[in-house]
């Protein structure tokens, strides 16, 4: 009986140690809200987001949106730079935009990879990084 009690106590301690030793992970979803590059792709309905389009989308606007996205995602990482293990995104035009996001100085240390679905309607592009 005494051995069983000791065994149960040790098992409970081992279980508790394993549970408390686990590191929480961050998983994030972010709607990028019409994040387009500036290149007109005839395969994609992106005419609105080109330098000639109604939104006059250009490299200055692109760089500003890229910087804002970098800031938001880096702020989620926090001061301890605990980067999210997965970031789901929507409304992204193509892989090139995602590559620019993960190459920014604050996001590059996260060592992200990309899984992306190209949609003919660019607004519906989704990805995980």
Task: Name these PLM-found stretches.
Residues 20-105, 111, 115-126:
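N-terminal, active-site-proximal structural segment of metallo-dependent hydrolase catalytic domains
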């Amino acid at each position: 009986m005494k051995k069983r009690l000791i065994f149960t106590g040790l098992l409970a301690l081992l279980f508790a140690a394993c549970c408390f030793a686990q590191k929480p992970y961050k998983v994030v979803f972010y709607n990028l809200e019409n994040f387009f590059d500036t290149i007109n792709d005839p395969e994609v309905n992106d005419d609105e987001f080109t330098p000639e389009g109604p939104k006059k989308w250009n490299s200055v606007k692109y760089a500003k949106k890229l910087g804002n996205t970098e800031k938001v995602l880096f702020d989620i990482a926090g001061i301890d730079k605990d980067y999210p293990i997965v970031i789901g995104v929507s409304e992204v035009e193509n892989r090139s935009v995602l590559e620019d996001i993960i190459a920014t100085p604050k996001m590059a240390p996260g060592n992200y990879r990309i899984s992306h679905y190209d949609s003919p309607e660019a607004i519906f592009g989704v990805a995980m990084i």
